């Protein structure tokens, strides 16, 4: 989760709000807290054993919530529910986030592990408006069972944010010999 922490460190300041959709992979909480940010929960709704995003609740978080949400952490496909978001679901989500100028950190480490009949849609395929306010995090470790590799990569299309990220990472631990 070093990538998530590093991106949060670049795009937030202590006290900023970060939206997390629970239930979710617990290290998202630690990364957010370690940056001094406030966790704002947007719980997933479970209907007929199927988890869904609560768009109305998400929209309400931008109207009066203090601190105003600055970052949204997306887990796609979702860990812990296994939910693969449809293109339409993601587009609706991104429309809300763009409207409120909210940065997107998309953890897509399970992108290559989806059940038959489902298709993963990466955050980087939703156009320039999304692309300029996103960071995609992923790694080979899940797909190829290489957890010990402990190496991941981050895609940040926005030049200014990518430069700040590289500056933040300078002098910090790099990859191992195999990564």
Q: What label would you give each PLM region?
A:
Residues 34-39:
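A short helix-loop-beta submotif of the ANL/AMP-binding
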Residues 133-179:
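PLP-dependent aminotransferase class I/II
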Residues 10-32:
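Conserved PLP-anchoring active-site segment centered on the Schiff-base-forming lysine
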Residues 44-116:
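Active-site phosphate-binding strand-loop segment of PLP-dependent enzymes
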Residues 1-17, 159:
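Phosphate-binding glycine-rich loop
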Residues 22, 41-46:
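Short beta->alpha connector loops at strand-helix junctions that form conserved
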């Amino acid at each position: 989760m070093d990538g998530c922490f590093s991106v949060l460190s670049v795009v937030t300041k202590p006290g900023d709000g970060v939206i997390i959709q629970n239930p979710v992979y617990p290290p998202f909480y630690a990364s957010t807290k370690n940056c001094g940010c406030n966790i704002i929960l947007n719980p997933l709704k479970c209907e007929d054993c199927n988890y869904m995003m609560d768009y109305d609740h998400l929209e309400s978080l931008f109207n009066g919530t203090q601190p105003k949400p600055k970052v949204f952490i997306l887990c796609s496909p979702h860990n812990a529910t296994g939910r693969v978001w449809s293109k339409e679901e993601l587009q609706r989500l991104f429309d809300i986030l763009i409207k409120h100028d909210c940065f997107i950190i998309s953890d897509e480490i399970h992108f290559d592990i989806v059940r038959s009949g489902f298709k993963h849609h990466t955050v980087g395929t939703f156009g320039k408006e999304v692309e300029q306010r996103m960071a995609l995090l992923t790694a080979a470790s899940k797909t190829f069972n290489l957890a010990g590799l402990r190496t991941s990569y981050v895609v940040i299309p926005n030049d200014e944010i990518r430069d700040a990220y590289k500056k933040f990472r300078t002098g910090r631990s790099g990859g191992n010999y195999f990564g």
